[in-house]
Amino acid sequence: MTASPIYATLGLSRNPFPPTPDAGSYFFTPRLEEDFAEIVHCIEARKGFVLLTGEVGLGKSTLVRRLLDTLEGKGCHSALILNTFLQDSALLSAIQSDLGWPATDSVEQGLARLTEFLIAKHQAGEVSLLVIDDAQNLSVESLELVRLLCNLETGQEKLLQILLVGQPELEQTLARTELRQLKSRIVKHARLSGLHEDEVIRYFDFRINAAGAEGRLSIAPVAAEALHRATQGNLRQIHLVLD
């Protein structure tokens, strides 16, 4: 792909700060790298229910894509639900469809068929993963369905690993009394936060060098301070300012 004249003038092969960051060149801070490793471990060890929360623009969806890429070659069979305005039985049908299993008419029948499917995957040595993005949109009833899915197990291991991804409102919903059983099943909760000021400098270097700068371009400390102050370390806001 030919670089835009603007980027080519700077010696870059592409836009280093696109509106949608690519998962292949994800920037890991030490705390995020630790959280990522723990999430991967929880899924591979079939521990069950993981929660990932953070404000809009902190890279949750990009991190999910990186996670799915990482797990793809490790015998993990995954379903990714992006339309969380589907509720109850419609949500279960979407989960079944994305896992490659025909939808059924009722929740009870769907859970029974899904259990059979997951047992077969488990016996084949595959890990089954359900990721629900924008999970703050789920109703209490749909989250109760998630709890039922959490209960599917062999006795020692969970048949379906679940990763709920959402904004902080999801934490508030899970704190409701009627969802205490679901909340108690969380084995790992990772909260994303904005970059610190020194991380903004490293993030700039990481993105600009990945686009071909090879150390020729840098950001002045005073500019990094202003960028951090204006964006609070929010990745989406950083990209909007620098694009």
Name the predicted role of every residue range.
Residues 41-45, 70-74, 120-125, 136-141, ...:
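Conserved catalytic network of the ASCE P-loop NTPase/AAA+ motor domain
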Residues 50, 73-83:
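Conserved catalytic segments around the Walker B and adjacent sensor/switch elements
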Residues 1-46:
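A short, basic N-terminal segment
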Residues 12-19, 76, 86-105:
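Conserved NTP-binding/hydrolysis module of P-loop NTPases
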Residues 53, 129-133, 161-167:
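Structural recognition of the conserved hydrophobic beta-strand(s) that form the central parallel beta-sheet
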Residues 121-125, 129, 154, 163, ...:
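Helix-loop-helix "sensor" segment of P-loop NTPases
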